């Protein structure tokens, strides 16, 4: 028997994010997923060492690797469309749920039982889910920052929206990252490596 789950996951590299906006550099879902997993792990370490928020860094990082897996089936729905109305938000949530179910069906039952909670977020506590959501937003904020730094004003409003959304989350780990890490994303290689 063949199980196409991982081959389908590999197609994340073909899904372009920010599809309704002019980008100086395209970003694939695969790139975003990796960035989000790295950020989620770091936010968990910040929680562990600085804020005391209980979390499992490895579990959150793995869940981050699968957090947008349903988009392989649904595509990347632009945020303004996804959250335009409660009806659209609910319909998209139902579509995501069905996508997770469809993808899990591409695995043997015992593997599906372990991966489904990573794809649908049920593997996470409320605090861990908040950290993953903050990492997802930070990834978007970093993309907007990079685009703006490249002179692309198409992302100005998105940058403002991402900052406001992060602030509204009242996530001390994200606040720590914004203060101590985000400014480095505007530095050049020599400044980053202090050569």
Predicted regions and their residues:
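Alpha-helical, largely C-terminal catalytic domains
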Residues: 1-195
